[in-house]
Amino acid sequence: MSRQSFYADPSSAGRQMKYRKDLFPLLDTREITACLLECEFNVTQELIVKPTADFVTNLFEQFLDTFMGIPLGTIRKKARKMSRINPLESDQANGKPQQSPEEDFNDNQENDKTKDTFSALQLLILHRYLAIFFSTCGINDFVLTDIARPDGYRIRRILSAVINFIRFREDQSPKFDHLANECEATADKVSEVQAENSATMQKINAIKEKLEMDSENDESNRKNLQYINSYNRKLETKLRELKVMQERLTKEHDDYKQEKALLAKKLYDINFLYNETQEQVANLTKYAETDLSILVKITEDLSNDLSSMQTNYKNLEKSYQNMGITIDSIQVNEINLKDLLKLAEDITRNVEKRQIEGKILKDNQDNLDELTRKQMELEGQILIVQNQLNKSNKKYQDLIVQADKKESAVKLKLEETKQEFNDILSEKEKHNEEHKRIMDQIVKIQQETTAIQDAFVKESKEVELKLINLMSIIKRYMSDLRNNI
């Protein structure tokens, strides 16, 4: 599951369309300013729209101080140490002996190179820390130009990711308060052990100095010195044990931090998958409500049309029977009667065809009911998947509560949860394929129904034309009959 976004040219007019969709919302400058001011960061809307390198550097250093525990000035100290710049060099410049102009020129060039190296190192170190922090926030395309030549849109996107991270941390922080308290207590214990170590070392040094002074003045203190040396060895042994304990506590604290980050990331992924499943359930419900009602209405309309056609056919058949009695007694109009019989046979075939089409419509309705039943079963399976996701969330909460237990038990529980999650994903893919197949069948039935409707309308018009011709023939025949009578 990738969360990367592609970096676009800041000067391009269509740079916003070159980013792939991020998992966090893009906020406007007003909301960004309000949120950062609420978090006690010194920002303005003008600086966010048109950021400067100094503003971005200071703001990002405050982010590192607040969220990663890197104090302000640490990056400058590391850059100064790496470039071997003496921070007091400018203050001591007046105390140097006077040099020749050529030596002064060479020194100035060397100082300029050193300062350039210091600026570049400071920028690289800041970028390294920020890349780690922004990757956690969902920004994986952070580059050096975002610090040296910041762009308004990219800074707005980065600040939106940071605010989304702050909101997520505020929502999830109550769940980890007890773990944070335990970490603070462990850190306090480590500090106490370190203070005890320092005090013990000071005592040892003081005793050594005192013993050295006493040994110079009086040789009778040798026995005491031996005793103190043995005591010192015991203290050194205890000091080594305390150092081992300190290293172990530090390692446990680092392991806890890594475990905490993994658990938080897994919780974010599960919430994201849960939201996607909710959207798919809503779409399935919408399809079920809309398509079924339309097909039922179409079927009812076709049934009503079929009933009206059958009624017309019965009336025509009755009229034909009444006219047949008169036609049998009249030999003169035999040819016209044959034409009428042929036309009546055509009408009968058309009516039988309508009945067949009605049967087909009924079969389609049965298929539609079957598809509806399968769709309802699929919705029930989706609800089961949703319940399984809820159970997974509950298990995940239990894992967070038991995070301070043995590492082996935590890993075993995480593997079980991961297996269940993979099963749910595979089951979800199967359900998606089944849903796609059902939707294809529904579309096919709709197309067949539309074709039948069109054919029915066309044949109805043809029958109406034939009925009109039949009525004209009957009227002409009746008028001829009256004239003959």
Curated annotation (Swiss-Prot):
Q: Where is the composition biased (Polar residues)?
A: 89-100
Q: Which UniProt keywords apply?
A: Cell cycle, Cell division, Centromere, Chromosome, Coiled coil, Kinetochore, Mitosis, Nucleus
Database matches in InterPro entries: Kinetochore_Nuf2_N, Nuf2_DHR10-like, Nuf2_N_sf, SNARE
- The UniProt annotation puts the region (Disordered) at 87-112
- Pfam family of the protein (one): Nuf2_DHR10-like
Q: What residue ranges carry the coiled-coil annotation?
A: 177-449
What are the subcellular locations of this protein? Nucleus; Chromosome, Centromere, Kinetochore
Q: In which family does this protein belong, per the annotation?
A: Belongs to the NUF2 family.
Per its database record, what is this protein's job? Answer: Acts as a component of the essential kinetochore-associated NDC80 complex, which is required for chromosome segregation and spindle checkpoint activity.
| Stated name of the protein | Probable kinetochore protein NUF2
Look up and give the organism this protein is from: Candida albicans (strain SC5314 / ATCC MYA-2876)
